[in-house]
Amino acid sequence: MTETTENVVITIPDKTSFTFHEAATSPSEGEEFVVGHFRELTVKISGSSTSREIKFYAVDENGEKTALSGTNKTDFQLGSSTLNTNEYWDFDIAGLFKVMFEVVSVTGDVTVKGIVVS
C-alpha cells in the first residue's frame, strides 16, 4: 500500500514476519509485537517440547495484559491459550497496541512465530 503526503511517498509493507519465541526452554513473556497498521496475525507454534502452555495477550499502552482469543486453524475453536504444538492460530489484531505470547511452562523447546498482514 502506498500513501502520498504532499510530495512525500511512504510505502507501507503489506506483510511481515515476527518471532515471539525462538526455541524457548523456560517460561518467558517473549517479544512483544507493536501492531501499528496491521490487522491480522497468523501464529505458528512448533518445537520439540513434550509439554507446554502458551497464553495469548493484547498489551495496552500502559503495559497491561488482557487475554486475547484466537481461532485454531485445525479445529476452528476459539481459545486464549494452548497446551498443544505444531498448530496455527489466527488473530484479529486491528486496533490493538501490542500482542504477546507468554510461555507459561515448557518441557523441551517451543518456537512461536507470526506473520502479520495489513
Curated annotation (Swiss-Prot):
Source organism superkingdom: Bacteria
Protein name: SPbeta prophage-derived uncharacterized protein YomS
